[in-house]
């Protein structure tokens, strides 16, 4: 009985103290501080500071990457067998996948889709793939001396017709395929059902092999059983790299930083440095033209192709279109028509920002 009475007294004392504290708290004066009074560091300053942080366990990570390189031949074999490769694990897999493509996929054409971008135009990607496949088939027929013309061009620009062309039996060579690398297939611009269905149909095409990476823990929920086993035909590879998301993080505002609405030269330089040297050189030609012709609507696409081909930065219109698709996906270049009806390319940055961008690229 005494124990029960003691428990009741303790509970009464606790509840009484609780309500007394609430009364005192309600009567107390509120702080005059505001959330806007907090000093928020500049985003560029925060990124520069973060870039100086030394990576820990660099020796172990280097050994881990060396182990992954021994698996490159196996991954190529799996692609040739018709599987899609899905890379998952902690850390950015962008550098690993690109190293695999540059080291082991040299016998194939490779097209890269950056799923971490705010927007991705999949129809433009499919058009570029169809044009590239058409060129590959022409080259193979010339080298084999075949007189059969076959279907060398796709009949229309509808998504269904393009996918049918990519899936068609235009070549008996099982190794006649294009490797499509998708960084962050679970990225914000690709998470909608329509984009995932398009990618699944693309992956099931006979002339396409997919190498993709995911980072979101719930990424597998994007697909149903048919997509996983029959269309994507995934082989899952656990490849944690523990690498920072330097490039992928550029397009997302930092929680602790003050965001900027305008695209800065620093951000554009980081994006361009992730592209191929030829892609950077094509962009430099466009930037230099825009600085020397400030009163024009932009550089005509035909002029950019001629200038790039003269300097051996591109070998065909297909190659230039591939670079332009990357520029547009990164929102580095915009297109519009001038008074003569020509398609012109324009960099949506001020002249000072373009000059600073060229200085950053030349360093």
From Swiss-Prot:
<comment type="function">
    <text>Essential protein. Component of the origin recognition complex (ORC) that binds origins of replication. DNA-binding is ATP-dependent, however specific DNA sequences that define origins of replication have not been identified so far. ORC is required to assemble the pre-replication complex necessary to initiate DNA replication.</text>
</comment>
<dbReference type="GO" id="GO:0000808">
    <property type="term" value="C:origin recognition complex"/>
</dbReference>
<dbReference type="Pfam" id="PF24882">
    <property type="entry name" value="WHD_ORC2"/>
</dbReference>
<comment type="similarity">
    <text>Belongs to the ORC2 family.</text>
</comment>
<dbReference type="InterPro" id="IPR056772">
    <property type="entry name" value="RecA-like_ORC2"/>
</dbReference>
<dbReference type="InterPro" id="IPR056773">
    <property type="entry name" value="WHD_ORC2"/>
</dbReference>
<keyword id="KW-0235">DNA replication</keyword>
<dbReference type="GO" id="GO:0003688">
    <property type="term" value="F:DNA replication origin binding"/>
</dbReference>
<keyword id="KW-0539">Nucleus</keyword>
<protein>
    <recommendedName>
        <fullName>Origin of replication complex subunit 2</fullName>
    </recommendedName>
</protein>
<dbReference type="Pfam" id="PF04084">
    <property type="entry name" value="RecA-like_ORC2"/>
</dbReference>
<comment type="subunit">
    <text>Component of the origin recognition complex (ORC) composed of at least ORC1 (ORC1A or ORC1B), ORC2, ORC3, ORC4, ORC5 and ORC6. ORC is regulated in a cell-cycle and development dependent manner. It is sequentially assembled at the exit from anaphase of mitosis and disassembled as cells enter S phase. Interacts directly with ORC1A, ORC1B, ORC3, ORC4, ORC5 and ORC6.</text>
</comment>
<dbReference type="GO" id="GO:0006260">
    <property type="term" value="P:DNA replication"/>
</dbReference>
<dbReference type="InterPro" id="IPR007220">
    <property type="entry name" value="ORC2"/>
</dbReference>
<dbReference type="GO" id="GO:0005634">
    <property type="term" value="C:nucleus"/>
</dbReference>
